Each structure stands twice: as C-alpha cells, then as structure tokens.
Regions:
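Hydrophobic topogenic segments
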Residues: 1-167
Length: 167
C-alpha cells in the first residue's frame, strides 16, 4: 500500500506543477491539428493542451479530466501531428486506467517478480499498440517520418516518468 500511496502522491504533485507552471497552447495551427485528430478519433470531451518545461516527453495526465502535456520546444507540423495522435490514442483507449490497475496489482503483489515484469511488458505493449494505430494505413515514408519523430522525442527527453501517465 505504501507503493501505491507514494505513486499517487508523486502523480498529484506532478499534475499540480503542470497546472500551475504550464501554459495553455494557443497557437492556431497546433490547436487546429489537435481538434482535427480529436474528431478523427471521435474524442468529444475537452482535453487541455499544455506546454510544460518540466515534462521529459509528451504525456497524458488525468483520469476524469485528462490533460495532454507537451515539453517546451519547437515541433514541425508532422512531429506535432504524430505526437498529438499518439497521445490521443492513449486517451481514446483509456490507457491511464490500465496503468492504474497495473500499479495497484504491483502494490498488492510487490513480492512477485512476475508482476513487475508483467507491468513493464504491458506498458511497452501499450506504447507499441499506439504506434501501430498511429501508422495504420500509412505508407513507408509516413512510417519513416513517425520513427524519426519517436527518435527525436526520445533524444530530447530521457527523464523520469510518472507511473500514472501515458507517453
């Protein structure tokens, strides 16, 4: 239970920092692209798009009121499209709820190394599944551009991740 409590406290503190120190993205092109992808994925609820200097990589935070967080920086139109679509696929699939479930199981069965492996594998599968959805029906050039975006994002931010976020 201490494990679960610790991660919830870390998550709440981080989300508070994002909401306090982040800034709402107001660039028209970025917001238009964001809304277009939301429509494409049939996501109806409001999701704030926030730029936060403390973010190591793009992520979704929140269970009931998700927030899409972008690290500060310049993104090309293609990079932004891929990043936003990847994160919104996480929202559409409810991956943050799965992560909460895995964290809870991990906290209860902390002594079982198979549970730790399962959590890590499940998180990796979630990411790969999102990657597959983003590139579904895309040509080789588009897949290459997406891969370059992933590598660029990885290169920019290799920080500590928050257990109760997607990214």
């Amino acid at each position: 239970l201490l494990y679960i409590f610790m991660h919830i406290i870390i998550y709440l503190h981080y989300k508070k920092q994002v909401m306090k120190n982040g800034r709402l993205v107001k660039e028209t092109a970025a917001l238009q692209q964001f809304l277009k992808i939301k429509r494409e994925l049939h996501i109806r609820h409001t999701i704030p798009l926030i730029e936060f200097s403390g973010a190591a990589s793009p992520m979704v935070l929140g269970f009931f009121c998700p927030v899409l967080v972008l690290p500060e920086g310049e993104y090309s139109e293609k990079e932004l499209y891929f990043i936003l679509k990847h994160e919104l696929v996480h929202v559409k699939r409810g991956d943050v709820y799965w992560k909460l479930l895995f964290m809870t199981v991990n906290g209860v069965h902390w002594f079982n190394p198979l549970i730790w492996i399962m959590q890590k594998e499940a998180a990796m599968d979630m990411e790969l599944s999102c990657d597959e959805r983003v590139t579904q029906g895309a040509g080789l050039e588009m897949k290459k551009a997406y891969t370059e975006t992933l590598l660029s994002t990885l290169h920019k931010g290799c920080g500590k991740s928050i257990v109760l976020s997607t990214g």
